């Protein structure tokens, strides 16, 4: 099946509704993807890119239903990655002499995947042209490291279509092809997710390359990407977004993510967020448990944020493995113009937070003071967490915040009041988790200072997920 793109240009690609992993398992394609290939029929017939290798046979069969394969005059490979050039072996078995136009770097990549150095490669550079008849030409623009060394774009004169390769695309599958036909919220979420997780390391190259392309003074009526939609309605809107995202992008947003062994670091995260909100209720704060969250969503939020707070329990004197992995990935993404702070709980040894602070600094973040708590945070420790959040809110504010008078209750008074009025601590008889009325359980909307008798009946133990009926009065407090 083909879809008319414009005049003599047809989409002959492949939708992939089921794909959920990309680049191994590093990118979660929660809304599927598409592999966009385009057939141009002028006096010369041109195929731009193929599809992912797993669809090779279907692609060639579908292409044969559109055109006699022997009538294809030129093949353009904008990018040698297997989701673009994966069907070349199947196709070239049918038309072995067809010329393949690509960059010099692409020849190395294509041969590395397909092992056919005898193919008829034609090397092109920025500014080279290819006459396709009817007064139209293809103009090639090299775009190295956006996002592979072999990458290029192809511009078609006359129809003013830019075949943009990975740039301006998104992993987004829909039966409809054009940007004005699909859900706009979904579309732009996937555009930003794609940029944040794939193109962020190359942001320093995005602006000069777009400037170079604009310098050709060529009209762009349509942008035909390699993944996702074709931009036909106001195509420059995505170009403007890329320029914005490439300029050390940040919103008035703070991302907190953590991993925890006994929920202690989670409690710290919640208290820090409360402190931030007390001082700056306008800043958006998002909290993620890395063990239960989509990694790419976390990284997209980091991309959007002015700062990030990263929490970890100490395990074997180092940070939790999922935190270490995510920080390593942030190092590779090379975020700029962002601040960071490490926090976490520990028992007899607290080496993780210091290691985490060093890793975040090595990743290019401007560091603020870290915060540690020993064992499960008590009232004093929770107040320190909230104060840390207040301090962070002021330090990271994009504009000066009004001064506020913080009313505090002495810790001794709180403790006395808690002991006198809140009743005993309760212990889960299954996993031994302890409910402290003075601390509550904020993640289940049980506020600090809530007696066990007032805890909702649908309360679940944070450790073993069993209900209130498995709790007993803590033995040390039983009378």
Swiss-Prot record:
Transmembrane segments: none annotated. Its cofactor is Fe cation; FMN. Residues 30-210 are annotated as: Zinc metallo-hydrolase. Binds 3 Fe cations per monomer. Pfam families: Flavodoxin_1, ODP, Rubredoxin. Residues 423-474 form the Rubredoxin-like domain. Fe cation 3 binds at residues 428, 431, 461, 464. It is found in: Cytoplasm. Fe cation 2 binds at residues 83, 166, 227. CDD domains: flavodiiron_proteins_MBL-fold, rubredoxin. Fe cation 1 binds at residues 79, 81, 147, 166. FMN binds at residues 260-264, 342-369. InterPro entries: Anaer_NO_rdtase_flvorubredoxin (IPR023957), Flavodoxin/NO_synth (IPR008254), Flavoprotein-like_sf (IPR029039), Metallo-B-lactamas (IPR001279), ODP_dom (IPR045761), RibonucZ/Hydroxyglut_hydro (IPR036866), Rubredoxin-like_dom (IPR024934), Rubredoxin-O_OxRdtase (IPR016440). GO terms for molecular function: electron transfer activity; FMN binding; iron ion binding; nitric oxide reductase activity. One of its GO terms (cellular component) is cytoplasm. Pathway: Nitrogen metabolism; nitric oxide reduction. It comes from the Bacteria. Keywords: Cytoplasm, Electron transport, Flavoprotein, FMN, Iron, Metal-binding, Oxidoreductase, Transport. Its main location: cytoplasm. Residues 254-393 form the Flavodoxin-like domain. Anaerobic nitric oxide reductase; uses NADH to detoxify nitric oxide (NO), protecting several 4Fe-4S NO-sensitive enzymes. Has at least 2 reductase partners, only one of which (NorW, flavorubredoxin reductase) has been identified. NO probably binds to the di-iron center; electrons enter from the NorW at rubredoxin and are transferred sequentially to the FMN center and the di-iron center. Also able to function as an aerobic oxygen reductase. In the N-terminal section; belongs to the zinc metallo-hydrolase group 3 family. Homotetramer. PANTHER family: ANAEROBIC NITRIC OXIDE REDUCTASE FLAVORUBREDOXIN. This is Anaerobic nitric oxide reductase flavorubredoxin. It comes from Salmonella arizonae (strain ATCC BAA-731 / CDC346-86 / RSK2980). The gene is norV.
């Amino acid at each position: 099946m083909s879809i008319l793109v414009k005049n003599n240009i047809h989409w002959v690609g492949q939708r992939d509704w089921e794909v959920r992993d990309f680049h191994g398992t590093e990118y979660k394609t929660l809304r599927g993807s598409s592999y966009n290939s385009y057939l141009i029929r002028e006096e010369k017939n041109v195929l731009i890119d193929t599809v992912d290798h797993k669809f090779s046979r279907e692609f060639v069969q579908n292409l044969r239903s559109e055109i006699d394969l022997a009538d294809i005059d030129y093949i353009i490979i904008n990018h040698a990655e297997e989701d673009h050039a994966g069907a070349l072996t199947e196709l070239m078995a049918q038309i072995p002499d067809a010329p393949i136009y690509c960059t010099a770097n692409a020849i190395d990549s294509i041969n590395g995947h397909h092992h056919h150095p005898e193919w008829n490669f034609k090397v092109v550079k920025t500014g080279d042209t290819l006459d396709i008849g009817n007064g139209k030409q293809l103009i090639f623009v090299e775009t190295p490291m956006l996002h592979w060394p072999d990458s290029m774009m192809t511009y078609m004169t006359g129809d003013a279509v830019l075949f943009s390769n990975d740039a301006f695309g998104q992993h987004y599958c829909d039966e409809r092809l054009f940007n004005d036909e699909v859900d706009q919220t979904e579309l732009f979420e996937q555009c930003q997710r794609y940029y944040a997780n794939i193109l962020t390391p190359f942001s320093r190259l995005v602006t000069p390359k777009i400037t170079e392309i604009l310098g050709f003074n060529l009209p762009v009526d349509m942008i035909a990407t390699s993944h996702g939609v074709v931009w036909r309605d106001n195509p420059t809107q995505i170009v403007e977004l890329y320029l914005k995202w490439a300029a050390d992008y940040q919103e008035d947003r703070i991302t907190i993510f953590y991993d925890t062994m006994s929920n202690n670091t989670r409690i710290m995260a919640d208290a820090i967020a409360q402190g931030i909100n007390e001082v700056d209720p306008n800043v958006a704060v998002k909290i993620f448990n890395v063990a239960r969250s989509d990694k790419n969503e976390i990284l997209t939020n980091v991309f959007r944020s002015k700062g990030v707070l990263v929490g970890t329990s100490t395990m074997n004197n180092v940070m939790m493995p999922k935190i270490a992995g995510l920080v390593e990935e942030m190092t590779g993404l090379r975020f700029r113009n962002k601040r960071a702070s490490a926090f976490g709980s520990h028992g007899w040894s607290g080496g993780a937070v210091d290691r985490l602070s060093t890793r975040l600094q090595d990743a290019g973040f401007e560091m603020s003071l870290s915060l540690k708590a020993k064992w499960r945070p008590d009232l004093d420790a929770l107040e320190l967490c909230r104060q840390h959040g207040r301090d962070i809110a002021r330090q990271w504010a994009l504009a000066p915040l009004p001064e506020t008078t913080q009313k505090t209750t002495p810790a001794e008074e709180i403790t006395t009041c808690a002991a006198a009025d809140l009743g005993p601590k309760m212990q889960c008889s299954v996993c031994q988790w302890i409910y402290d009325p003075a601390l509550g359980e904020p993640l289940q909307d049980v506020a600090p200072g809530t007696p066990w008798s007032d805890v909702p009946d649908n309360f679940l133990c944070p450790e073993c997920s069993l209900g209130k009926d498995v709790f007993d009065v803590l033995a040390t407090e039983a009378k």
